[in-house]
Every structure is written in structure tokens, then in C-alpha cells.
Regions:
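Charged, low-complexity intrinsically disordered regions
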Residues: 1-199
């Protein structure tokens, strides 16, 4: 048993997630990155439904995975005057009718939704340089991603990759290819941390 509970809690974020009954994390790894407490894990969301079999009259549960992704939390050791959440635009936006902040960067606004409780402050936090760096990382992401920055400096990064950290998949990659992929995926996450570390 691990005496230290996980730092990362997917339900503690403003990141929009699919409807689900159960949220579970696995493969927690905690460490430091450039002096920042950091934790990564695999998050799985499942939807559980019950149905009754006509033949037997017995109730059964059906569990369906609706989301699997790689998540990282980094404590940036600084405070921010407000929170922000960035998540990808998609067809569901019209259904949710979520209010999104326009940044003035056409490419960023086409690709991402942005929410916060203070539009003026969030646009200072999300400087033009930060937006360009996020757009550059979007080009090399392993899936659709979302970012949630809390006022206390906790930075959540979630990638809907369909697999977890260090999954070997179907065994098509040799050990050298696996190491290279694992390093590339971790580097992507640390590059996103770097976007929010500087002024």
C-alpha cells in the first residue's frame, strides 16, 4: 500500500470530460521536474449501466470505457490571479454552449476553447508567446489535450491518447522504439510545463 495518496485528482479540474460513472487512475509516478513536484498517471473513465436479461430475469452490469488518457500534474510553486482551462474545440461545443474567451489569436481561437472567471487577467496570463508555444505543441501531441491552471499554481495536463503512460501496445515496437516513444511522450508533457513556468 502506498502511504502517500496521489496528488492528481481528475475530478479536481475544470477539464470537460465525457459523461462517466467511475473515474480511476493507475500507474501513478511521482517525482520532481526542475524542482517542481510532478505526478503522472493514466486516467480511465467508465460508464456503467445495468440491464435485466429477459431469459433469466437477472440484473447485469455493463461497463464501457469512455475515455483513457495520460495526465500530468505539476505544482508550479507560484500563484496566479485566476484559473484557466484550455480544451479542444469539437462538434459538441454547440451542445454544451460553453462560453469561451476569444484571445485575438485566430489560430488559437479556432483550435481551442478558453474559460476563466476573469477574462482580462487570463489574457495577460495567456500571452501571445504562450499561445504560440501551445499551438506548436498541439502539432506534436499524441491526442487531443486540455490544460487546467489553478490559482495555487497546480497545472493539470490531460491528453486523450487512448492509452496510458508506458503502455507497450500490441508489441509491435522493439525495446529501443518503446524507449524513444516513452521519452518523446514525457518530453511533450514537460514542454507544456515549461510554457507555464516562465513569466
Amino acid at each position: 500500500m502506498n502511504p502517500d495518496p496521489p496528488l492528481l485528482d481528475a475530478n479536481d479540474t475544470n477539464i470537460p470530460l465525457p459523461n462517466h460513472t467511475c473515474c480511476s487512475g493507475s500507474g501513478y509516478i511521482r517525482g520532481t521536474y526542475r524542482g517542481l513536484n510532478t505526478e503522472l498517471c493514466t486516467v480511465r473513465l467508465t460508464e456503467v449501466s445495468e440491464f435485466q436479461r429477459e431469459e433469466t430475469g437477472m440484473w447485469e452490469k455493463n461497463e464501457q470505457v469512455v475515455y483513457t488518457g495520460q495526465w500530468m500534474l505539476s505544482e508550479l510553486n507560484r500563484e496566479f490571479p485566476t484559473w484557466l482551462t484550455i480544451w479542444p474545440r469539437d462538434k459538441m461545443d454547440k451542445l454544451f454552449r460553453s462560453k469561451t474567451i476569444q484571445t485575438g489569436n485566430e489560430d488559437f481561437d479556432k483550435r481551442f476553447n478558453l474559460s476563466s472567471d476573469d477574462e482580462e487577467v487570463v489574457l495577460r496570463i495567456l500571452s501571445p508567446d504562450r499561445m504560440e508555444r501551445i499551438l506548436a505543441l498541439a502539432g506534436s501531441s499524441i491526442g487531443k489535450f486540455a490544460v487546467n491552471l489553478k490559482p495555487d499554481g497546480r497545472l493539470y495536463i490531460a491528453v486523450h491518447s487512448g492509452h496510458g503512460f508506458f503502455d507497450i501496445g500490441k508489441g509491435r515496437e522493439n525495446p529501443a522504439q518503446l524507449r524513444e516513444r516513452f521519452a518523446r511522450e514525457l518530453r511533450w508533457f514537460t514542454d507544456m510545463i515549461e510554457v507555464f513556468c516562465g513569466e
